[in-house]
């Protein structure tokens, strides 16, 4: 879905409005969208929040979606496969190149979870894709740690007006 109008309201309700009731319906929609991407024994993982942001927000909306999706598609999920090793500033208002620069090296595979992804296909899940910088950093971390393939799935995406 596009991240505008009702799509934006839905994502923000989950992200900042504690509307966890939207997780299951969103997971059903994500499961349909994920079907062409899914492989046997795929590992599903959310995009991580830095621990300080997690304390402030109290939950990771992408982790809630990843868990619900994994149940729906009967695949293993690992909520802490990835970690934010750097506390980055908010990406709001940054240009595309600034977003990629800010996230360079900011995400890595949890050292105690690396064994879960070696030689496996991984599906990374996030709530919104804006520039792709976060998903790119997470994908690179997974591939560098030995993932076979990495696919990405988001609930919404930002599209530029043309």
Language model region names:
Residues 71, 76-162:
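PRPP/pyrophosphate-binding module of the type I phosphoribosyltransferase fold
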